[in-house]
């Protein structure tokens, strides 16, 4: 999985050199941010269930047809609702992974790369997940640096889906 730090080390190693002062400064910057990122990951993990459920309800409110249209990819049944919450939780989990590693690698590697194909195959609308992520961003309860860190990855996911 790529992160800014692993990419810097890989580049230096492939060129047979030590890390440059700029690369080392980047590493120090990341370590200074790490505390805020880990606090955000911890808080989001602790609230994951309520955030995913609330986000699903936000989707149902904005897109009411999702709860009235029949089919395995809609939330007209409890099974469909459970799948929706599960899928939103997956996005949230990827955000927490990004916070832990300090880069967009988890979103890039595990989600964004194949999202268009997944959405097309299962007739899922990216706008549902955009709405869910907006809800999470507005309701995660974080402030200060942890909020800045979390919001940057949430925004990254929103932009990738838009």
From Swiss-Prot:
Any Gene Ontology CC annotation: phycobilisome
Localization of this protein: Cellular thylakoid membrane
GO biological process, one term: photosynthesis
InterPro entries reported for this sequence: Globin-like_sf, Phycobilisome_asu/bsu, Phycobilisome_asu/bsu_sf, Phycocyanin_a
Coiled coil: none
Binding-site residues for (2R,3E)-phycocyanobilin, renumbered to this chain: 84
Membrane topology: Peripheral membrane protein
Induction: Phycocyanin-1 is expressed at similar levels in green and red light (constitutive phycocyanin). Constitutively transcribed in vegetative cells, not expressed during hormogonia differentiation in red light.
Post-translational modification remark: Contains one covalently linked bilin chromophore.
Pfam name, any one: Phycobilisome
Protein family: Belongs to the phycobiliprotein family.
Gene transcribed to yield this protein: cpcA1
Keyword Membrane: yes
The UniProt record lists the keyword Mitochondrion: no
Name by which UniProt lists this protein: C-phycocyanin-1 alpha subunit
Keywords: Antenna complex, Bile pigment, Chromophore, Electron transport, Membrane, Photosynthesis, Phycobilisome, Thylakoid, Transport
Top-level taxonomic group: Bacteria
First-listed, main subcellular location of the protein, grouped into a coarse class: membrane
Protein source organism: Microchaete diplosiphon
SUPFAM superfamilies associated with the record: Globin-like
Entry function: Light-harvesting photosynthetic bile pigment-protein from the phycobiliprotein complex (phycobilisome, PBS). Phycocyanin is the major phycobiliprotein in the PBS rod.
Assembly: Heterodimer of an alpha and a beta subunit, which further assembles into trimers and the trimers into hexamers.
């Amino acid at each position: 999985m790529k992160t800014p730090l692993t990419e810097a080390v890989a580049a230096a190693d492939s060129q047979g050199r030590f890390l440059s002062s700029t690369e080392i400064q980047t590493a120090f910057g990341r370590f200074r941010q790490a505390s805020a990122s880990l606090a955000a990951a911890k808080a989001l993990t602790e609230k994951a269930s309520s955030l995913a459920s609330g986000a699903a309800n936000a989707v149902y409110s904005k897109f009411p047809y999702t709860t009235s249209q029949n089919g395995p990819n809609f939330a007209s049944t409890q099974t469909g609702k459970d799948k929706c919450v599960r899928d939103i939780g997956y996005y949230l989990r990827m955000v927490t992974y990004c916070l832990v590693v300090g880069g967009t690698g988890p979103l890039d590697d595990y989600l964004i790369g194949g999202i268009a194909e997944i959405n097309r195959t299962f007739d899922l609308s990216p706008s549902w997940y955009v709405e869910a992520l907006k809800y999470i961003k507005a309701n995660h309860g974080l402030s200060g640096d942890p909020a800045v860190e979390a919001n940057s990855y949430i925004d990254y996911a929103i932009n990738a889906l838009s």
